[in-house]
Amino acid sequence: FGVPKEIIASIIGIESSYGSIKGSTRVIDSLTTLSFDYPRRSKFFKIQLENFLLLSREENFNPLELNGSYAGAMGYGQFLPDSYRRLAIDFDEDGVRDIINNPVDAIGSVANYLKRNGWQKDADIAVEASLVDKQNPISTIWKMKKNEHLELKPKNQIEFNDLKSE
């Protein structure tokens, strides 16, 4: 996949504290509540609920036993059900895609997720930036679009044309 192991480890560390905190809420309860009691996000979570039920059937999970986050994310990488169905892989080739209990499948699935969402091997993953025409330059990672009002200027050209979103 071309994704550095440090990036995958960082994501799994942030999302589930390396698998030690994968969520304690029943996924079916989270998704049902968010689907029907929160109109602003109802459409999104109804899609997740449908995907969760399909995933449970496809992977032979008991939908009443799976725990995850309050938003219905599951496993080491905290995949939502639609991402689990599309992007989870059987990285250890044991015949099962298990990103909830199997760290090997989770590692491969995080790499697959990044690759399928535009990861480019050997591309810059952070860009040093400084404030334009300001006295105190900043060297940190910024989301460029969100912070346009700060007049941030990357020190190197950034190419966005190859990135994609699903």
Regions found by a protein language model. Give the residues of each.
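Catalytic glycan-binding domains that act on GlcNAc-containing polysaccharides
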Residues: 1-165
